[in-house]
Amino acid sequence: MKKQDLINLTKKTHKASQTLSNFTSDDKNKLLKLIHVNINKNRNNILKNNKIDIQNSKDMNKDFAFIDRLTLTEHKIELMLNGIENIISLNDPVGKIIEDKILDNEMNLKKITVPLGVIGVIYETRPDITTDISSLCIKSGNAVILKGGKESMNTNICLTSIIKQSLKEFGTDDNFVNLIESTDRKITKEFLQLNEYIDLMIPRGGESLVKMVGKEAKMPSITGGIGVTHIYIDPSADIDKAISVVLNSKASKPSVCNALDTLLIHSKILPTFLPLMIKSLSESICLLLYWQTCNRIHSIKNPFGTTKNKHAAKRGLK
């Protein structure tokens, strides 16, 4: 893709956004239902393309966490479909009166929510973001330009094609949703300069991506949290609740960027809490690493009974 191709793509998306902004709630929900139907119909093709991306990433020796974020399964497609259903069920964010007052000159002043226009989204490995973001943008009346990671390109192209075909079937402009298929990093930087056509940029990924967007983007940007993912267990903690929170924060999806990294336990609750926590984690895909303090208190040679647990062995961890 050349710079002019990118500009042409953003112009088309910008023009389409003017049509989408006038869609009624019923229009948007019907369109999302059609996208839901077509993704469900094409799940085999989605999985086929995803397998190509997975194999390419394995050939590049990507690690387990990376492959896990990249991988789509029947279950993950069900979650994608559930996500669209949940978005359909949301109240329309457009057209809400958030302030209404009469000024001194008797003029009625109203503050009403409207679409932003065109949203650019740069994300990394996870292809399910393609449907999440597209659905949220349609629901909020915004057109979107997607820039996914090169490793998930085949899956993203497949998903975007299904969405664009749904737009055509609905009888509207398929430029509501566009995907930048180039893997050239120069194109990414050019993308961040197009504030004439893009109203907001959202990076979804690691610290380096977020910092790069914050530094390079000429349009406003919204960045997600990339901060500390720690949990502290206080002596006053409800042990059962604390274990449940830790498991949900880590074991439910350990490969994502906001999964729990560090567990800090107060020494007063450590003798009671740690053995129960270890038992709960023993069947998860998490590898527990701990300071010698824990080892001295409990004489734990290894919380999983061997030098590496069965899940860690599958991941090639030592």
Q: Can you say where each PLM-predicted feature lies in the sequence?
A:
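General structural feature for long, well-ordered alpha-helical segments within catalytic domains
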Residues: 5, 9, 16, 27, ...
